A protein has these predicted regions:
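Conserved metal-phosphate-binding beta-hairpin within the catalytic cores
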Residues: 10-13, 19-25, 78-105
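Short histidine-centered loop motifs in beta-beta connectors
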Residues: 391, 395-397, 403-412, 435, ...
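A long amphipathic alpha-helix within ATP-dependent nucleotide-binding catalytic cores
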Residues: 2, 6, 51-89
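Catalytic cores of soluble metabolic enzymes centered on carboxylation/carboxyl-transfer
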Residues: 69, 109-329, 334, 448
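A structural signal for short beta-strand/turn segments enriched in small hydrophobics and glycine
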Residues: 210, 410-419, 424, 447-453
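ATP-dependent carboxylate/phosphate-activation module, predominantly the ATP-grasp catalytic core
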Residues: 25-67, 104-119
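Long, charged amphipathic helices and adjacent flexible linkers at domain junctions
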Residues: 134-142, 372-396
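Single conserved hydrophobic/aromatic residue that forms the stacking wall/gate
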Residues: 451, 455-461
Length: 461
């Protein structure tokens, strides 16, 4: 291409890091650097965790790379805030120029946190013709800052973007970290824009404390309605290799990282108990008769109350009953509700008291437990006539993507034959023939997206 038949051969760098240098240059020829950021943890070649300073770069390398960036900027008479990006060889300490981003980067807050310099303000001052108010020797670095990018995407499905409505989004529960958000509760996440919901930044005197602080902040926030990479980020930040600074660009490929929150048996018990009693109290308060009765009222003859909950793969039937002294007995635990309203429940389970914020959207529940958000679905006690899709029905039981079409127009099938396979909620669902017949018309295509109850086949007997 370009009328040039020369071939460029680049050296293969087995263990590499993405290191970038923040610079400021004014129209008077003054250029300084504000140290490095490491942005090596990436998926699909896009950054998800950035930090400053890098755990790999020592003061000598910082000065060497910083001066290389300053020299380049002075050569082109650069005038603005900018980022000079380098490829760094983790084994040899060599580095190579990649590009200059002539703007503030998404990750610029980590530099602000460790230098105390407002980069947005400095960029505006430079643009209006002001001279830099400091020289290189004035720049110092304090502590460690880490930023995580919170995306509406599914790490368990190749980080594909997700859509939906944010039924819950409350970051006030995690005020110890900085949230730069572009969404609120009720925001509709679509496909027209980048799926980043927020960037979350922590600062601490040292790197391990900054990582732990950021992980806990992500964990404490209350959000749901759209699949995010939150648990994946938490898993990265708590990973031993990450904490040891082994963060080369192959980090995600070589480490075993959680894509979904895995609940212990005790955590599952606590979450299901809190949800069941919150639902019981909510239903009781809305009842015109029981809403006026004492909370511990019972006629002594009522059977155990039951509610079925689905937690990702775990289906739990919670059995509970009212006991004396305003206590509840739930699956062997003694529980007391200290306060309960539509926003959440203050509950004590086996002498362990905590408050859990609760959001309900249809049959979906998001409960903010001491160990983080837990998502569950309330399963119906009885299948409502007319609303269920019989097994083998020819309509889609849920929204999803067609990943396999087993038949075509004119195909003869027997009852029970698989016609279409749909992928939804990261599981495969087969639509089967309810009786023998011949396919009259194929109404969907491979890889097409279909909506719930959308027809997939017409056929004749």
């Amino acid at each position: 291409g370009f009328g040039d038949d020369r071939i460029f051969i680049e050296r293969y760098v087995e263990k590499s890091r993405h290191i970038e240098i923040q610079i400021l240059g004014d129209e008077y020829g003054n250029v300084i650097h504000l140290g490095e950021r490491e942005c090596s943890i990436q998926r699909r070649h896009q950054k998800i965790i950035e930090e400053s300073p890098s755990p790999r770069i020592d003061p000598f390398l910082r000065e060497e790379m910083g001066q290389a960036a300053v020299k380049l900027a002075k050569k082109i008479k650069y005038c603005s805030a900018g980022t000079v990006e380098f490829l760094f060889d983790d084994q040899t300490d060599e580095f190579w120029f990649l590009e200059v981003n002539t703007r503030l980067q998404v990750e610029h807050p980590v530099t602000e946190e460790v230098t105390g310099i407002d980069l947005v303000a400095e960029q505006i001052k430079i643009a209006r013709g002001d001279e830099l108010e400091f020289v290189q020797d004035d720049i110092d670095w304090h502590g460690h800052a880490i930023e995580a990018r919170l995306y509406a995407e599914d790490p368990g499905n190749n980080f594909l973007p997700e859509v939906g409505t944010l039924h819950a989004y409350d970051t006030s529960l995690a005020s110890e970290v900085r949230w730069d958000s572009g969404v609120d509760e009720g925001s509709i996440i679509g496909t027209d824009f980048d799926p980043m919901l927020s960037k979350v930044i922590s600062w601490a005197p040292n790197r391990v404390d900054a990582a732990n602080k950021l992980a806990r902040g992500l964990e404490k926030a209350h959000m749901g309605g759209v699949v995010t990479n939150r648990q994946f980020l938490i898993s990265c930040l708590r990973n031993e290799s990450f904490l040891n600074g082994n963060t080369t660009t192959d980090f995600i490929e070589r480490e075993v990282l959680e894509t979904k929150k895995n609940l212990s048996a005790n955590e599952l018990h606590q979450a299901s108990t809190a949800i069941a009693l919150w639902l019981a109290q909510k239903n009781r308060d809305s009842d015109p008769v029981t809403g006026f009765m004492a909370a511990n009222w019972t006629n002594g003859r009522m059977p155990l109350q039951r509610v079925k909950l689905l937690f990702i793969q775990d289906e739990v039937e919670v059995k509970y009953k009212f006991n004396k002294d305003n206590l509840y007995e739930v699956m062997g635990s003694i529980c007391e509700i200290h306060h309960c309203d539509s926003a959440g429940i203050d509950i004590e389970i086996d002498s362990h008291r905590f408050y859990a914020h609760v959001t309900k959207a249809g049959s979906e529940i998001i409960i903010n437990m001491p160990f983080g958000d837990v998502n569950a679905s309330v399963l119906p006690r009885f299948i409502e006539p007319g609303n269920d899709v019989p097994e083998g029905g020819l309509i889609a039981p849920m929204p999803g993507k067609v990943i396999d079409v087993k038949v075509k127009k004119g195909s003869k099938v027997k009852a029970g034959d698989t016609l279409v396979i749909i992928e939804a909620m990261k599981m495969e669902h087969s639509i089967k023939a309810t009786e023998a017949g011949k396919v009259a018309k194929v109404m969907i295509q491979l890889l097409s997206l279909i909506h719930i109850s959308e027809p997939t086949r017409q056929w004749s007997i």
